[in-house]
Amino acid sequence: MQTIKCVVVGDGAVGKTCLLISYTTNKFPSEYVPTVFDNYAVTVMIGGEPYTLGLFDTAGQEDYDRLRPLSYPQTDVFLVCFSVVSPSSFENVKEKWVPEITHHCPKTPFLLVGTQIDLRDDPSTIEKLAKNKQKPITPETAEKLARDLKAVKYVECSALTQKGLKNVFDEAILAALEPPEPKKTRRCVLL
């Protein structure tokens, strides 16, 4: 049985572990426990063939910056996560996470994943952001960043309501099995 290795990265507390636990067990964890390193495996059927989807959770905290890349070798696809209600986690996608994974695994496809979409319309969350002159990240803003950073695509979900959750992993599997064709570059030739 073929295994697909999927590694999840992103800032601490954006919901990486909840995403994985909600997907693999259909239960939402009730308390926050910072992750050092965990992995989960699920069997998925693709075109009538069984695949093992190996899901590797990582710690977003800076203390683990030297340890985290040890989980990167042989990765088939990365999920680069940010919370749609945490502008700093969105900023770190381009400042930290994409540079980190492309440094270690330059040819590995990645998806940009917006988490906690159930909070996008939550009045107290919106109020907290407004106090700092911020607002939730829109899908359009995230899609533009995904294009700019050459992500396979942008997907978003809520681990709490499970909205969009299965789609995140379906898209990750597709990206791993059918990595996008490298764009042909045209050279400028002066005669």
Curated annotation (Swiss-Prot):
Name which cysteines form disulfide bonds.
none
Q: Lipid anchor (S-geranylgeranyl cysteine) at which residues?
A: C188
Bilayer disposition of the protein: Lipid-anchor
Q: What keywords tag this UniProt record? A: Cell membrane, Cell projection, Cytoplasm, Cytoskeleton, Differentiation, GTP-binding, Hydrolase, Lipoprotein, Membrane, Methylation, Neurogenesis, Nucleotide-binding, Prenylation
- This enzyme's EC code(s): 3.6.5.2
Q: Which GO terms describe its cellular component?
A: apical part of cell; cell projection; cell-cell junction; centrosome; cytoplasm; cytoplasmic ribonucleoprotein granule; cytosol; dendrite
Residues reported to bind GTP? 10-17, 57-61, 115-118
Listed SMART domains: RAB, RAS, RHO
Specify the domain of life of the species encoding this protein.
Answer: Eukaryota
Instruction: List, alphabetically, the InterPro entries matched.
Output: Cdc42, P-loop_NTPase, Small_GTP-bd, Small_GTPase, Small_GTPase_Rho
Which GO molecular function, any one, fits this protein according to its record?
A: ubiquitin protein ligase activity
- Pfam families linked to this entry: Ras (PF00071)
**Regulation (activators, inhibitors):** Regulated by guanine nucleotide exchange factors (GEFs) which promote the exchange of bound GDP for free GTP, GTPase activating proteins (GAPs) which increase the GTP hydrolysis activity, and GDP dissociation inhibitors which inhibit the dissociation of the nucleotide from the GTPase.
In which family does this protein belong, per the annotation? Belongs to the small GTPase superfamily. Rho family. CDC42 subfamily.
Instruction: Please give the NCBIfam families that the UniProt record associates with this protein.
Output: small_GTP
Physiological role: Plasma membrane-associated small GTPase which cycles between an active GTP-bound and an inactive GDP-bound state. In active state binds to a variety of effector proteins to regulate cellular responses. Involved in epithelial cell polarization processes. Regulates the bipolar attachment of spindle microtubules to kinetochores before chromosome congression in metaphase. Regulates cell migration. Plays a role in the extension and maintenance of the formation of thin, actin-rich surface projections called filopodia.
In Swiss-Prot or TrEMBL terms, this protein is called: Cell division control protein 42 homolog
Organism, by scientific name, is Gallus gallus
